[in-house]
Amino acid sequence: CSAFSRSHPALYDQPGGDYTPTKREIAAFEAGIKLGALYHQFVGAPVSSRTAASLEKAMQESISLQPYVREVKVHIDRDMLAANVFGYGELEGRMIEAQVVIDYQGETVTARLQYDQEKDYPLMSLV
């Protein structure tokens, strides 16, 4: 639980317009924010089979700092890593499998980022 979420526990409690989202909707939204941030912050990062584990850890620790995050797991598919002439490659979205557990005021959701081979695209989903 970050300092931000402790100091702003009711961040979404202010009604906006004619609709106030449910706690579950807020938790799902927060999960999407976390996975989107993870994807866009790290795709393109230099990575090799030697550094993949430390990059996974950095990704997990970075996202775990954000509000409402209970758990983060990240796996980089080592079979997809391709080294250039200098011995490393770039992290691609299709290499990332990530899962976040979000707890917003007692409502918990789990979301996943995973490459969909059929669509040839990394997709997020609630699980």
Language model: regions and residue ranges:
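Short beta-strand/helix segments in adaptor/scaffold domains that form protein-protein interfaces
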Residues: 1-127
